[in-house]
Amino acid sequence: MITTLIEKIKETKAPICVGLDPMLAYIPDEVKQAAFAEKGENLEGAAEACLRFNEAILRETADLIPAVKPQIAMYEQFGIPGLIAYEKTVRLAKELGLIVIADVKRGDIGSTSAAYAEGHLGLSLIHI
């Protein structure tokens, strides 16, 4: 796989990996509003907003970059709908010819740890 990544970096002339760590606070309001109008202001709507934002990023950057790195915790916080958004994001990235580096480690930085905690039913504390 590393050989493929190196070739893709040479092809794009971009030693860059775009992180796909969707946080609702950073998704444009128009994207969130459209997703909430279709799916509701719930986990499904939040996951749909993330997916739409990811799709836009992927389509705009696919010919410029070699790889993307979706952070699983940012999807898990939206439950099953979030995992579906993660799967669709990965599938689209692959269809667009991008290398996908899954960021699925546990024990991470503050925002990621908070997303893991939220993904576990909003519990006050979790042990990781």
Regions from the PLM with identified roles:
Residues 70-82:
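Glycine-rich, proline-tolerant flexible connector loops at the mouths of alpha/beta enzymes
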Residues 126-128:
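Conserved small/polar residues in nucleotide/adenosyl-binding loops
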Residues 102-122:
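Glycine/small-residue-rich loop that forms an oxyanion/phosphate-binding "nest" at active or ligand-binding sites
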Residues 58-64, 95:
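Acidic (Asp/Glu)-rich catalytic clusters
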Residues 83-101:
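Alpha-helix-loop-beta-strand connector modules within alpha/beta enzyme cores
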Residues 19-25, 73-75, 105-109:
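Active-site beta-loop-alpha junctions enriched in small/polar residues
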Residues 1-60:
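N-terminal glycine-rich anion-binding loop in soluble enzyme alpha/beta folds
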Residues 18, 68, 103:
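Conserved, mostly hydrophobic/aromatic
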